[in-house]
Structures are given as C-alpha cells and as structure tokens.
C-alpha cells in the first residue's frame, strides 16, 4: 500500500488533538479511523466561509509533490478511475478500511504546460485541496478552475478548502490568485480550521440556487 504524503486530519466529524510532535511543514488532512460519530458534531454552526467542521487541532506535516517527479507517480499506483472527460482526469486512491474520506487526484488533460496533479480529500460535501510545494507551472490556474467546476457540478460539494505555508516565496501571488477566484482567507481561531499560525487557509463557498428563493 502506497504511503501518501497527504496524511489525514479528518475524523468522522471533528478533528482530534494531535500529540506533541515536530511539525515542520504544511498542514494536511488526516483521518482518525474508528472514531465514533459524536452527538455534538451535529450541533456545529457554520459561520462561513468554510465547511461544517469543529477543530482547534494542529495539523501534521505536508509535502505535496504536485505531479513533479516520481512522487506524483507513486500516488496513482493504487488509484482507480473516478471520472474522465475531454478536459479532466480524476483518479481515486484506494480507500482505507472504514474510511469516510475519499482521496482524489485531479489532472488536466491535453495540457502543454508542466505536468500538475492536484490532490485532495473529499469528506461529505466538503473538498480539501493542498497547494503543491514549489513554483506552480504555467496553466495551473486553468487546471484548478476545472477542478472547481468539477467539485461544484459533479461532486456537489458545498465548500472547497485550500491551504498553503505562509513562508512560501509566492505567497502574495497565491493570495491574489485565489482571492480573484473567489476564495476568502479563513481567520485564525476560526472553528472550522485547525490552529496553525504557519499556514494560510482559504475557503470557497459554492452558492446554490434555492427553488424557494424569489
């Protein structure tokens, strides 16, 4: 079984507190298996933006290769076809036993730019995406737009989360780019994200038309 760089921080509904350890890099999504669903999880409020979640936990380390080098190929060794069309290929990694989280790999088809794979975790109606380390290749914005469109139309998610390290050289550029795409910074202390002062979290809320609205 391939060890994923995207470890999990999601349990059935709420994050669990991580034991003290060295956390040198980016946050990731981690699943605690066999965690019973708590009654309090159903009472969580949703002070948007962001998904319905409870947490104040730090996140474990992250290193997302983003499709550069052999690490990317390792991700797809156990992955199966999830969706395919003329523009986008989506693979699903082999699920863990009793896992409620689905790990997906998104790749734009027919791209003339450097190969890029976005990796994310789907939990319920929320999709969590980590920004690959290093400089994003040309065309990455277009491929992420395809990901967002797929998340809205095919996955029917309510929110998309992204996270990246504050120490990135391209931090300002990432903030501008994702803000332009409709993402909002999730403020420190927000109940929907873990406490990580070294990381930026941004959230995209997918608005849906209501038949009852005038």
From Swiss-Prot:
PANTHER family assigned: ORNITHINE DECARBOXYLASE ANTIZYME, ORNITHINE DECARBOXYLASE ANTIZYME 1
Gene source species: Danio rerio
Gene name linked to the record: oaz1a
Species classification: Eukaryota, Metazoa, Chordata, Craniata, Vertebrata
GO biological process, one term: viral translational frameshifting
Protein name: Ornithine decarboxylase antizyme 1
InterPro entries: Acyl_CoA_acyltransferase, ODC_AZ, ODC_AZ_sf
Assembly mode: Interacts with ODC1 and thereby sterically blocks ODC homodimerization.
Entry similarity comment: Belongs to the ODC antizyme family.
A GO CC term assigned to this protein in UniProt: nucleus
């Amino acid at each position: 079984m391939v060890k994923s760089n995207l470890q999990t921080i999601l349990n059935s509904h709420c994050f669990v507190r991580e034991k003290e350890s060295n956390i040198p890099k980016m946050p990731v999504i981690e699943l605690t298996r066999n965690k019973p669903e708590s009654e309090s999880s159903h009472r969580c409020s949703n002070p948007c933006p962001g998904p319905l979640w409870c947490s104040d936990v730090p996140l474990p380390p992250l290193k997302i290769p983003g499709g550069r080098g052999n690490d990317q190929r390792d991700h797809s060794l156990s992955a199966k076809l999830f969706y395919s069309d003329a523009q986008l290929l989506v693979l699903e990694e082999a699920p863990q036993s009793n896992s409620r989280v689905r790990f997906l790999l998104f790749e734009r088809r027919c791209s003339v730019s450097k190969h890029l794979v976005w990796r994310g975790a789907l939990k319920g109606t929320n999709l969590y995406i980590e920004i690959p380390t290093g400089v994003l290749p040309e065309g990455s914005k277009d491929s992420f737009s395809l990901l967002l469109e797929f998340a809205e139309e095919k996955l029917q998610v309510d929110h998309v989360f992204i996270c990246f390290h504050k120490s990135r050289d391209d931090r300002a550029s990432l903030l501008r780019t994702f803000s332009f795409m409709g993402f909002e910074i999730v403020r420190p202390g927000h109940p929907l994200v873990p406490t990580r002062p070294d990381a930026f979290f941004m959230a995209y809320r997918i608005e849906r038309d209501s038949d009852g609205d005038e």
